[in-house]
């Protein structure tokens, strides 16, 4: 499963339209890191805000109501040089905390992804507020293993997004 995910990530490097996948590409994506057919691929642990949440395929609303979504078209969360995994979560839901406290993180804070027995630890190195359609900070950077967490800002409404990038 990890090898197939790494091959998928390598193919993303040459796919300029990766954030708008075709139906076939989306079906392939959803089949990877999907051991139990629920779409759950692992979980994220953020000690600083006492957060441990399941990570699921896609950023569809049904996913974001219950957990953290993996942005299709971004690298799958298996690490490696030339990867950039992007994870999204809601803030301000009455039914769940999710990424409500994400704005409390600062540069140097650590979070960990647990995926198929792998443990990937990242350190926040950049915090930015961006417009909803701005994918500039989500690009893959040669030689880097990156993960960005993002959520809506200000609290409870989506005017823009807070991006926390980590390496």
Regions from the language model: what does each represent?
Residues 50, 91, 128-131, 153-156:
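A generic structural motif
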